[in-house]
Amino acid sequence: MAAKIRREDEIIVLAGKDKGKRAKVSQVLPTGKLIVEGINLVKKHQKPNPQLGVTGGVIEKEAPIQTSNVAIFNQATGKADRVGFRFEDGKKVRFFKSNSELIK
């Protein structure tokens, strides 16, 4: 099945501590989760490793967020939207359900 949300898509968060924020998807995981730039930041306590040149301390990194908690952002309407699929010229393409415009 084709992915409704892909890398580099602009999304809006629907639920959680970052609700309402917009950002770009940096990675789509096979478990149905996304890594989104600047969203769902967690603090990780990093142990120093001199052999690898890694300094220790508390670092902030992006944790995965469930796909169901985000929606693709439609620039034309300025709102969250749903994704549909259709065939055009023998190719499967994604489109916004609200105004039928193609995504990218």
Curated annotation (Swiss-Prot):
Keyword presence, Chaperone: no
Keywords: Ribonucleoprotein, Ribosomal protein, RNA-binding, rRNA-binding
A single cellular component GO annotation: ribonucleoprotein complex
Gene Ontology MF term list: rRNA binding; structural constituent of ribosome
GO biological process: translation
Record-linked PROSITE patterns: RIBOSOMAL_L24
Coiled coil (residue ranges): none
rRNA-binding found in the keyword field: yes
Function: One of two assembly initiator proteins, it binds directly to the 5'-end of the 23S rRNA, where it nucleates assembly of the 50S subunit.
Assembly information from the UniProt record: Part of the 50S ribosomal subunit.
Similarity comment: Belongs to the universal ribosomal protein uL24 family.
Descriptive protein name: Large ribosomal subunit protein uL24
Organism per entry: Shewanella denitrificans (strain OS217 / ATCC BAA-1090 / DSM 15013)
Gene encoding the protein: rplX
